[in-house]
Amino acid sequence: MWIKELNLTHYRNYQQASAAFSPGLNVFIGDNAQGKTNFLEAIYFLSVTRSHRTKSDKDLIYFDERDCSISGTLERLSGRVQLEILLSDKGRITKINTLKQAKLSDYIGAMMVVLFAPEDLQLVKGSPSLRRKFMDIDLGQIKPVYLSDLSHYNHVLKQRNAYLKSVHQLDSDFLSVLDEQLVTYGSRVMAHRLAFVQSLAKEANKHHQAISNGLEKLSISYQASVSFEHQQEIYQQFMDQLKTTHQRDFLRKNTGVGPHRDDLIFYINGMNANFASQGQHRSLILSLKMAEVSLMKQLTGDNPILLLDDVMSELDNIRQTKLLEAVKKENVQTFITTTSLKHLSQLPKDISLFKVNKGTIALDSVMID
């Protein structure tokens, strides 16, 4: 798939903007604070209905306006698709081919993206919530049913925690009813995550070995808060562990086990990547991002769109070359933001170059090798 055009109204610093893209490489160039990342963020938001930079939709609306819209035309293997998101103080509306989508799981997945931004370099050493978010975003695009299971799980978890905080004496029978619902959805979430991480680890290691010239092996371990050896055991193990922590949960007023406590651990040559060098971290994240691209292609049969937000300047020449080689091999539509082409000496010549300046975007040139 590839996005053919994007239209913004009252989005960030764009009062009105439109751009048509090539199915290959698209580069946004401009000084800092002109709107390059905002434009890339809009593509990302149109896909996953969330920003990678803010939790508040209000931050996305142009100064002194009450609403904004993002719309785009997507070319998929199955045909052309029109996507639109409307944001206002009343909430948000998502549309596919002008039809409102009642649930996020009905919308997300229509356009798949993989984002590589500077903050992704914190994925290994950052909080576990970052790694859970990483799994959620990928799985949500690949498997819509995952979002449904996760949404139901979070709803029951909120109910359970609210109950624990509100009572002075535990009603085990009532808690068991909540446990049953929590385990039903939670075990599905963990099963999805386990299968995803196992597949992702294989792809990531392939890319990492290519980047390291065969010197390093990358492995990823899914650290579920529920102990189990086989996928078939997840439901029963989760139920058993939840029952044994009733008193603990009552005293602490929260739920101590479940997928909301999951984590990932990365290893390079068997050593925890927390202790890896800065260069190794960059190689690891680069491998992970290209593995996301490969896996989405494998599991859905269509290409995701790759968004590279000012990351080329974070990579040395060798890693830049490896990244661009991988992009060329995967043959996916790619967007790159940069302040200068000097960081992009390894770029192929067949690119569409857009100049971004003070909330305007214009095609500067199409260079063909």
Swiss-Prot record:
MF-aspect GO terms: ATP binding; single-stranded DNA binding
Gene Ontology biological process: DNA replication; DNA synthesis involved in DNA repair; double-strand break repair; SOS response
Record-level GO cellular component terms: cytoplasm
Main subcellular location of this protein, as a coarse class: cytoplasm
Gene3D superfamilies, A to Z: P-loop containing nucleotide triphosphate hydrolases (3.40.50.300), RecF/RecN/SMC, N-terminal domain (1.20.1050.90)
Key word Disulfide bond present: no
Pfam family, one: SMC_N
Keyword tRNA processing attributed: no
Binding-site list for ATP: G30, D31, N32, A33, Q34, G35, K36, T37
Localization per Swiss-Prot or TrEMBL: Cytoplasm
CDD domains with a match to the protein in the record: ABC_RecF
Keywords: ATP-binding, Cytoplasm, DNA damage, DNA repair, DNA replication, DNA-binding, Nucleotide-binding, SOS response
Classification via InterPro entries: DNA-binding_RecF, DNA-binding_RecF_CS, P-loop_NTPase, RecF/RecN/SMC_N, RecF_2
PANTHER family linked: DNA REPLICATION AND REPAIR PROTEIN RECF (PTHR32182:SF0)
Functional summary from the UniProt entry: The RecF protein is involved in DNA metabolism; it is required for DNA replication and normal SOS inducibility. RecF binds preferentially to single-stranded, linear DNA. It also seems to bind ATP.
NCBIfam families linked to this entry: recf (TIGR00611)
Family named by the database record: Belongs to the RecF family.
Protein name, per record: DNA replication and repair protein RecF
Organism annotation: Streptococcus equi subsp. zooepidemicus (strain MGCS10565)
Gene: recF
